[in-house]
A protein has these predicted regions:
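Extracytoplasmic/secretory soluble proteins
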Residues: 4, 8-9, 13, 17, ...
Length: 629
C-alpha cells in the first residue's frame, strides 16, 4: 500500500509528498538512521572531494559555468570541486534503473519511479546536523505539512527548488505565454485586439498577407511551436489550466478542480492544441503558410526560423529574433511578444509552496559517499544569506549593511549591476564574471530571489522593486507597449486589459504532495499517451470538422475501453485529498503577503457552464462516465 511521502523545503514554501511503498524501502536497502551504501570508488581531486551533479539536458539549456564567480564561491564554501553534467532523458532512465548515479541528481515529474528504484537517500535523519536551513523560518511550514500529510515513519527524499513567488506582479518584461506575435508586424496592423483564438488567427493571416516573406527573403509561416503538448492553449482564458501537472490531468487555475485531459476535450489543453493546430493547417495549407516541417524539424532548425523571424506567431516568447536585430538597429521593434489581453492568463503571483515541483527537484544518491558535502550544498542553497550573495555578489564587495542595519548596494556594486542589467557583456563587469540568479540552471537555487530574508527585506533587495524595473527597462518592445497602452510597465498593460494571473493556482504543489498511482494504473496511462500520439498528425491534418470529430470520438472510445477514466477517478480522489490541505495553506500565505485571491465572482466568466454548475461534493463521487466532447 502506498504511503504519502513528503519533502520539506526552504524559506517560503513547503514540501512535496510522494508515495513510498514497502517495496521501495526494501529496494533502497536502508531505513531511517542507517548510513547509505558505499560506492566502490571515491572521487577526489587533489585534497578536495569531487561532488558530482547530474542535471537534465531538457532544462532550458546548459547554464552551468564553473568559471563563474558564484559557482567558484560555492565550491570554496563547501571545500569541494564540483563536476556538473547534463544527461539526456534516455541516459537518465538507464542510470536510474542501474543505480549508477552521481552524488546529486535532478528529478523528473514522476517521483514515484525514483522511490521504487530505491536510488534516493532518505536524508531525514541528517537534516538537523547537515542541512538545518531547511528546518528554519518559513520552511517550517513545509516540515509541518510533511508531518500532516505524511506520518512519522515516512522519509524525506527530495529537495524542492525555487521556493517563493514565480513572478511578483510587476516586471519590465511581459509574460512569455499567451497570444505571441511578431511585434513589428502587429504594430503595423494598428494593435488589433485579440479576444479569442479566432481573432488571433485573423491577425496572423493579415500579417502573412502583408509579409509572405521576411526582409531577407525567407518564407513566413502563420505559427510556430516546438511541441504539441498544449503549452500555448493552457494559458488561454477559455481553458485556464495548469500546464505542469503530471500526465494529462490538469487543474483549473482558479478553482483547482482537476480534469481528465484524455477524455474530456472541453477541459484539455492537448485536445485544444489539436483543434488549434488544425485551424492553422486548414487556414494555411493552400498558400503554404502552415509550416509542415513542424512535424519533423529539429529544435535547432526551429530556433533558426525563430531567429530569422519566419513565424508570425509563436507558442511562447522567444528572444532570438530581437537579439539579432538589436545588434544592427538600436531602435528595432522586431521581436516576439505577448499581446496584452484579458483572453489569456498571466503567469505571475504564483506562490510555489513546493517550488517548481514535482518536475524540478533534487535528490542525493543512496550510494553517494559524499552525503555530508551534498547536504551542505543544499544547506547553502536554502540559506537566505548565501542566496543573496549568489544574486547580488559577495557581501563587502558589492553590498553591505549600513549603520541602521539596512542592506544596500555600494557605489561600485550598483554601477556594475546597472550596467549588467542594461545588457553589458564586458568581461570585466562584476556580474558578467560572477553570474546572476537568472543565469543559474533552471532548478537552482532552492530559494527565489524574492524570498524574505530574516533582516526584513527580500533576498534581492536591490532589483525586485517596481522602481528598479521602471528605471532599468531597456527593451524597445516593452517601451512601445507602455507608450501604446498608457502604462508604466508592460505587466500593467495585462491587468489594464482585464487579464488575470495565477494567484489562485495550487496545481504544482498539490501534484507534488500526492501519493502515486500504482504500476497497473501507470501502464494504462502509458498506453493512453500512445493512443493520443497515434492520432496527433491525423487530427492536425484533418480536412473537415467531421473528419476531426470522428478521429476524436474514436480515440476517446479507445481510451474508455482501455480503462483510463477509472484511473482518473482514483487520481481525482488523491488530488482532492491533497488539495483539501494545500489550498487553504496557499491562500493563507497569499493573504499574508498582500496578494488577495480571486473570488468566484471575479473569475466566473472564465468557467464554462459545466464548471460553474458542478457542486464540489460531486467531484469525488463521479463514476466512470466520460463527459461528451
Amino acid at each position: 500500500m502506498k504511503r504519502i511521502l513528503s519533502f520539506v523545503i526552504s524559506a517560503f514554501m513547503i514540501l512535496a509528498l510522494l508515495p513510498c511503498s514497502a517495496a521501495a524501502e526494501q529496494a533502497a536497502g536502508q531505513t531511517a538512521g542507517e548510513q547509505p551504501a558505499e560506492q566502490p570508488t571515491e572521487a577526489v581531486a587533489g585534497d578536495r572531494v569531487v561532488l558530482t551533479i547530474a542535471d537534465m539536458n531538457t532544462r532550458s539549456g546548459n547554464r552551468y559555468n564553473g568559471e563563474m564567480g558564484m559557482w567558484r564561491y560555492l565550491a570554496e564554501r563547501l571545500g569541494v570541486e564540483i563536476q556538473y553534467d547534463y544527461i539526456s532523458p534516455q541516459e537518465y532512465s538507464a542510470r536510474l534503473a542501474s543505480g549508477d548515479l552521481p552524488d546529486i541528481v535532478a528529478t523528473d515529474k514522476n517521483l514515484s519511479t525514483i522511490l521504487e528504484y530505491g536510488v534516493a537517500l532518505n536524508v531525514d535523519p541528517y537534516l538537523e546536523e547537515y542541512c538545518p536551513n531547511i528546518l528554519k523560518g518559513d520552511a517550517r511550514l513545509t516540515y509541518d505539512v510533511f508531518k500532516q500529510l505524511g506520518n512519522e515513519g515516512d522519509g524525506f527524499y527530495f529537495f524542492p527548488v525555487k521556493i517563493g513567488y514565480n513572478g511578483v506582479g510587476y516586471d519590465n518584461e511581459t509574460t512569455a505565454r499567451g497570444y505571441v506575435v511578431r511585434w513589428d508586424y502587429y504594430k503595423e496592423l494598428g494593435y488589433p485586439p485579440i479576444n479569442n483564438e479566432d481573432d488571433f488567427l485573423s491577425v496572423l493571416l493579415q500579417m502573412h498577407k502583408n509579409h509572405p516573406v521576411t526582409e531577407e527573403g525567407y518564407p513566413t509561416y502563420l505559427y510556430g511551436t516546438d511541441n504539441f503538448s498544449g503549452y500555448d492553449t493552457a494559458f488561454r482564458a477559455e481553458l485556464s489550466v495548469d500546464y505542469w501537472a503530471p500526465y494529462k490531468y490538469q487543474n483549473n487555475i482558479f478553482t483547482n478542480e482537476i480534469f481528465d485531459g484524455y477524455t474530456d476535450p472541453a477541459h484539455s489543453m492537448w485536445w485544444a492544441s489539436m483543434e488549434w493546430e488544425n485551424k492553422l493547417y486548414r487556414a494555411g495549407k493552400a498558400d503554404g503558410s502552415y509550416d509542415m516541417d513542424l512535424f519533423t524539424q529539429t529544435i535547432e532548425q526551429f530556433d533558426a526560423k525563430v531567429a530569422r523571424g519566419q513565424y508570425l506567431g509563436l507558442h511562447a516568447e522567444k528572444s532570438g529574433l530581437y537579439k539579432n536585430k538589436i545588434k544592427t538597429d538600436p531602435n528595432t521593434l522586431t521581436g516576439y511578444n505577448t499581446v496584452p489581453t484579458s483572453a489569456t492568463n498571466f503567469y505571475t503571483n504564483v506562490y510555489q509552496l513546493l517550488g517548481n515541483g514535482p518536475g524540478y527537484m533534487w535528490f542525493i544518491s543512496a550510494n553517494s559517499q559524499h552525503k555530508e558535502e551534498a547536504l551542505s550544498l543544499f544547506n547553502l542553497m536554502y540559506d537566505p544569506d548565501f542566496v543573496r550573495e549568489l544574486t547580488l555578489g559577495r557581501r563587502g564587495e558589492t553590498w553591505d549593511y549600513d549603520a541602521e542595519g539596512v542592506p544596500r548596494m555600494n557605489e561600485y556594486g550598483q554601477e556594475q549591476l546597472d550596467a549588467y542589467k542594461a545588457g553589458s557583456t564586458d568581461p570585466d563587469n562584476y556580474f558578467v564574471s560572477w553570474g546572476s540568479f537568472d543565469k543559474m540552471p533552471s532548478n537552482w537555487p532552492c530559494l527565489r530571489d524574492n524570498s524574505p530574508h530574516p533582516d526584513g527585506y527580500m533576498v534581492d533587495f536591490a532589483t525586485v522593486t517596481r522602481e528598479y524595473e521602471k528605471a532599468t527597462m531597456s527593451n524597445n518592445i516593452s517601451k512601445d507597449i507602455c507608450e501604446h497602452y498608457g502604462v508604466e510597465l508592460p505587466t500593467d498593460a495585462f491587468y489594464k486589459a482585464g487579464g488575470m494571473d495565477f494567484r489562485n493556482d495550487c496545481g504544482e504543489a498539490i501534484a507534488s504532495c500526492m501519493s502515486s498511482l500504482n504500476r497497473d494504473q501507470l501502464n494504462i496511462l502509458s498506453k493512453a499517451e500512445a493512443i493520443l500520439l497515434d492520432a496527433q498528425v491525423d487530427l492536425i491534418l484533418a480536412e473537415t470538422d467531421e473528419e476531426w470529430e470522428a478521429i476524436r470520438d474514436e480515440k476517446i472510445r479507445q481510451l474508455v475501453e482501455l480503462g483510463e477514466p477509472e484511473v482518473f477517478n482514483v487520481y481525482r480522489k488523491k488530488w482532492n485529498d491533497a488539495a483539501e490541505i494545500i489550498v487553504p495553506l496557499v491562500r493563507e500565505v497569499q493573504v499574508r503577503n498582500g496578494v488577495t485571491p480571486y473570488t468566484p465572482e471575479q473569475y466566473a466568466d472564465r468557467l464554462g457552464p459545466e464548471d460553474s454548475a458542478q457542486e464540489p461534493e460531486d467531484q469525488n463521487s463521479a463514476g466512470t462516465e466520460v463527459q461528451e466532447p
